[in-house]
Amino acid sequence: MQNTQTPSPMPFGKYTPFQDQIRVELPDRTWPTRTITKAPRWCAVDLRDGNQALIDPMNSERKLRMFTLLVQMGYKDIEVGFPSASQTDFDFVRTLIENDLIPDDVRIQVLTQAREHLIERTYESLRGAKQAIVHLYNSTSVLQRRVVFGMDEDGIVDLALQGARLCRKFEETIPGTTVYYEYSPESYTGTELEFAARICNAVVAVFEPTPERQVIVNLPATVEMATPNVYADSIEWMSRHLDQRENVIISLHPHNDRGTGVAAAELGYLAGADRIEGCLFGNGERTGNVDLVTLGMNLFSQGIDPQIDFSDIDHIRRTVEHCNQLPVGERVPYGGDLVFTAFSGSHQDAIKKGLEAMERDAAAAGKTVDEIPWAVPYLPIDPRDVGRSYEAVIRVNSQSGKGGVAYLLKAEHQLDLPRRLQIEFSRVIQERTDAQGGEVSAAQIFDVFSDEYLPSGSGTPEWGRFALRGTRSVSVVDGADTLEVDLHDDGAENTVRGTGNGPIAAFCAALGSRGVDVRVLDYAEHALSAGGDAQAAAYVECAVAGRVLWGVGIDHNITTASLKAIVSAVNRALR
């Protein structure tokens, strides 16, 4: 097949390929053959990196609500602000400490640049904390060295070392606080690997890590510049070249400029990282930080404990939307409104069959559905595991098929339609969606179903020619039933009789006396609920006046439900 694409008018030539800027070469890489088997250490940076990117930054109420959510979910490293750069951030850190709002197993993290007055102010904000992470950073990339700082490599290293030494100096002013250190060569992805290793090793040496007080070396994709495999190669290279590796925690901080932040984080973790920083639902500058929800739930979907509680995803999303004053998109993985929803007919049919197979397999094993491995097409996880119901899994529009319509009727109204009735009714819904457009809700589907197959509540004219008023079995002779039927026929009340092999055949004969030729072709029934007073649903396929149509009847008496279903089919044929 010929490729008919043509050159675009876009000025792509003004951009330099990444490999021509930074060389990342690791021919003996080992990360591609590794498998993730456990959760990394997590650090939530919603209150700092996420907050700085908001149109309306969080006030104290929203900050506290976000912090409370992160603690409840199980995050143990939480970056809470940049106290030297903002009085609001400083006051928030003090509020957390002075009101004893930080659990003993949670480490707050604060950010600072490598300047003395900023570092001093940072330590002032931490006074009284049990433990804290001081996160020191300075930019190291080729571009920023040239256009922002006007410094060579030695000047950038000196700046970082000055900051590290000042941190150690001011650490002495808060002797009651256990201080851990984190260092970030900001713009790491635009930094030569040899220089990144040089500056990180120099800073780590000043911080003097031990097994009990490891140093975090954070390697941020401040701007995502290449494919995720390149980031992973750089992480494995750094892991090999960092001094005192056993006392160093390699942390990742991916951004999503190229749309591959999650992939970069996962591959970087495979490549030797120990920790990942990000935000809930990927908030952050430009296209956002890596999404901690997606990362955690990806682990969960592989049978790995994320060590974070996502069991009420809608509460998490509502809180994040309130705090950030930004919506979470409908298609955002795991948390969006539509992520567990199928509109496609073939997808709906596969989901319906998958859920039914799960129920059969569980029953055969003598277990509940939750006790057997999840295996449903198009649903990577059970929506109930994150607090969702199955109500929104299948939704109907013009692209939907019989499987989705049938699933909603069964899930919402316990109506288990026979296959040919599913096909027939899906055509009715298709006509409705083609004519009106948009989505049809489960409630609207049932309304259409009722209008089509069940008696209306406003009288017989809208329903059809016949209405069943009552039946009496008159006699049974030689296996043949004679049935007396009270029938409303086109505005008049009539009593007719019919004889046949069973009540259904007798009823068809009674209708014959009114000039209606009806034959039953197929029949199905089931209870709508458990218990002695449960209603039953009957589905009858009939040939009436040269047409083959289904009818539906619902009644506490299964025989009456069957006769109502015949009336339903006849009325539909005669409308």
Curated annotation (Swiss-Prot):
Keywords: Amino-acid biosynthesis, Branched-chain amino acid biosynthesis, Cytoplasm, Leucine biosynthesis, Magnesium, Metal-binding, Transferase. GO terms for cellular component: cytoplasm. Residues 456-575 are annotated as: Regulatory domain. Its EC number is 2.3.3.13. SMART domains: LeuA_dimer (SM00917). One of its GO terms (biological process) is L-leucine biosynthetic process. Its cofactor is Mg(2+). It is found in: Cytoplasm. SUPFAM superfamilies: 2-isopropylmalate synthase LeuA, allosteric (dimerisation) domain, Aldolase, post-HMGL domain-like. Pathway: Amino-acid biosynthesis; L-leucine biosynthesis; L-leucine from 3-methyl-2-oxobutanoate: step 1/4. Mg(2+) binds at D49, H253, H255, N289. It comes from the Bacteria. It catalyses: 3-methyl-2-oxobutanoate + acetyl-CoA + H2O = (2S)-2-isopropylmalate + CoA + H(+). Residues 40-314 form the Pyruvate carboxyltransferase domain. It holds the Pfam family LeuA_dimer. One of its GO terms (molecular function) is 2-isopropylmalate synthase activity. NCBIfam families: leuA_yeast, PRK03739.1. Belongs to the alpha-IPM synthase/homocitrate synthase family. LeuA type 2 subfamily. Catalyzes the condensation of the acetyl group of acetyl-CoA with 3-methyl-2-oxobutanoate (2-ketoisovalerate) to form 3-carboxy-3-hydroxy-4-methylpentanoate (2-isopropylmalate). Homodimer. This is 2-isopropylmalate synthase. It comes from Kineococcus radiotolerans (strain ATCC BAA-149 / DSM 14245 / SRS30216). The gene is leuA.
